[in-house]
């Protein structure tokens, strides 16, 4: 999910996606760009997500463009201001109007690859050294039908975020600033009770709207043994979350509200409200990705108040969700354009600690310090831990850390040598699934008499009929 926002989807988008997929099978892969060269014979690389207003982002990318064209005189960059959202992507892809280079999220890889909208980058990944240096857990997130169709941009795994001040008041911190780690979801409830009793604040906060609720719920449900979909022998997809395991996970969420009274009074919590509640000290814990401190400082949360640790276990599995963003290349691109795109990508996402990488990384960390953000979390990297880029970034984080490192040490150790299963997001219609699950969560948090199994039975049927059947 990250910071790249997606507009809420309706059933029509699922139908449009299905139609676009059908069109792609007939012709998307066969035709390459006709105007891939300019008058000077340079390869034209159209770059999407170009900032459309003055500011740091525009200045940075314009400087990168100038350097790139100087270092790669056979390529010319053309600006494209479109940014990814599912409501326009499939129409643009079917119409052949995607920029050569674009960005998206892990959740789109399977569908983009299946539709033939993303170029096969397998050989390019080998040529530029990415294949030997990519984190194995991330590789499967950029692979569709045994083809690598994207280069990872960033990655993160879920952890248990906590408010240091509330943990201290609740007696849940060691003397050196290390939090006590709940081993499972039952202990999370006990910790939340202590926070509510000792501080008067909500022990836990969960998002419930704009797909954020479903996003978090999937990772919880997996640990209860739930499965959300499976591919049949005929290639079709079947929804599979009308099960006792999924119902048990939803019951755990429901009990936070009705049995234990540990959640905020407002049950309609979108992404911004989620971060606002946590960032203003109104809740003690949540499930969040490792980059969450960037979101909560705008609400006044100070670096010394921010903590994160390992994801707790469930009754059936100990698993965490892997999320992230990707670089992709249109399947309409010629071989020269694919090569140019890979060179462009290397200036943005690299496993090598080049001079430019070192400069950009240090400047970024110093800017975070100026902005009052936490420096200390070593997020899950798309690259192997022994790559020079990861090592250099970690050295800088240790050098510039602006809070007690023990507040995040358990998460950093968890990321460095993750002892549990790291699972990518669901492969098909993932954003639609999140919306469906949002509705389930809202139903059980607003209706004390809601039957979790019945709620999921209907949701499973709706998801199958409205989305999976349209693939």
Predicted regions and their residues:
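Conserved N-terminal structural module of periplasmic/extracytoplasmic solute-binding proteins
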Residues: 2-115, 125-130, 174, 336, ...
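Extracytoplasmic/periplasmic solute-binding protein
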Residues: 33-34, 144-153, 158, 168, ...
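Alpha-to-beta junction loops
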Residues: 75, 93-104, 117-119, 201-202, ...
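Short helix-initiation/N-cap motifs at beta->coil->alpha
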Residues: 80-89, 107, 183-187, 265-280
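Short, solvent-exposed loop/beta-turn-alpha elements that line the ligand-binding surface or hinge
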Residues: 92, 119-134, 177-181, 204, ...
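C-terminal lobe and pocket-closing loops
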Residues: 292-302, 316-321, 328-435
